[in-house]
């Protein structure tokens, strides 16, 4: 009974102490020693996490759809232009055709001149004139026997060109060359103010120092022709070279000379005239007249026939620059069937 009463007394005291304790203001901060009050429901609810707003994705720029058009056909590559043939080859073919076929070859000659004009227009004009001189040679050129005709200029504008002839092996002159010189002497006396040009190189097999021109000039001087009038060209070995080197000398050293008269054997006059005319044309600008003109000839008489068409072709081919083909044509070694027959 006493023990029960004691426990009741203790409980009563504790209850009274709790009821008498002062209340803590709501606004007062809790000290570390104080026990925190129970959290509210709001405090227990976590704050919502902010969700980042995505940046707007830029809309792609619309690409214009190409409107189909008519596509032109690709241009094919140009056909390569073939290299033109060398001029000398065209001249050779042209000369051989005309020498072989004569008037029948005129169409072929025109065709070859057209080919030449496409690549060498200035040369084509010159060679057209040369071929015309060849075609009309026989009807244009009359051979004067013994002396030059009357009416030529008796001034230093005229040059009498004496063509050489092969020397004997010891360097002396053959009779035919003396015959040419006798004609040249008559011409020099008839036109005493004209130059006399001797042309021809070394052709003596046993005396290399002897030249046709040297022998001729010595002979003329001994016969009374003034040395101031006598000109010497002693490097040429063919008639085509006679023409080229003589023209070169006159144009270079004697620009006063405007006309030449050729002295040779009768069979040789026409071919020589053609070569000198051709060389004069080749030295002339297209559209101009040659600086030197062949105006006359004089010849010693022989029993020989005129030089062949092959010989004439050979001289022109040599003037064009092909000495080997020229030699073959001149000495009848050339294959005249080299080019196809004409229809």
Predicted regions mapped to residue ranges:
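Bacterial N-terminal signal peptides that target proteins for export
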Residues: 1-8
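Histidine-anchored nucleotide/phosphate-binding helix
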Residues: 174-193
């Amino acid at each position: 009974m006493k023990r029960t009463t004691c426990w009741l007394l203790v409980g009563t005291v504790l209850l009274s102490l709790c009821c008498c304790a002062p209340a803590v203001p709501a606004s007062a901060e809790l000290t570390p020693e104080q026990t925190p009050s129970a959290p509210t429901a709001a405090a227990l609810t976590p704050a919502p996490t902010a969700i980042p707003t995505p940046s707007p994705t830029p809309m792609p720029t619309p690409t214009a759809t190409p409107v189909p058009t008519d596509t032109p056909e690709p241009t094919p590559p140009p056909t390569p232009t073939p290299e033109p043939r060398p001029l000398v080859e065209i001249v050779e073919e042209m000369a051989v055709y005309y020498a072989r076929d004569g008037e029948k070859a005129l169409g072929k000659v025109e065709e070859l001149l057209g080919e030449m004009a496409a690549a060498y227009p200035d040369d084509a004009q010159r060679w057209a004139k040369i071929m015309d001189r060849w075609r009309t040679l026989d009807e244009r050129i009359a051979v004067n026997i013994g002396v030059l005709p009357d009416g030529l200029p008796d001034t230093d504008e005229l040059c009498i060109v004496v063509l050489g002839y092969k020397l004997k092996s010891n360097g002396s002159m053959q009779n035919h060359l003396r015959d040419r010189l006798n004609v040249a002497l008559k011409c020099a006396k008839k036109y005493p103010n004209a130059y006399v040009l001797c042309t021809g190189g070394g052709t003596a097999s046993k005396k290399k120092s002897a030249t046709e021109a040297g022998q001729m000039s010595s002979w003329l001087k001994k016969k009374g022709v003034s040395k101031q009038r006598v000109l010497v060209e002693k490097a040429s070995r063919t008639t085509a070279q006679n023409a080229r080197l003589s023209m070169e000398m006159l144009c270079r050293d004697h620009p006063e000379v405007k006309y030449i008269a050729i002295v040779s054997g009768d069979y040789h006059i026409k071919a020589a005239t053609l070569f000198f005319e051709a060389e004069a044309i080749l030295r002339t600008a297209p559209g101009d007249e040659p600086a030197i003109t062949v105006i006359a000839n004089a010849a010693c008489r022989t029993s020989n026939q005129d030089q062949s068409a092959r010989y004439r072709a050979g001289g022109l081919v040599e003037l064009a620059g092909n000495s080997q083909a020229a030699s073959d044509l001149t000495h009848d070694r050339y294959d005249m069937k080299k080019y196809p027959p004409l229809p």
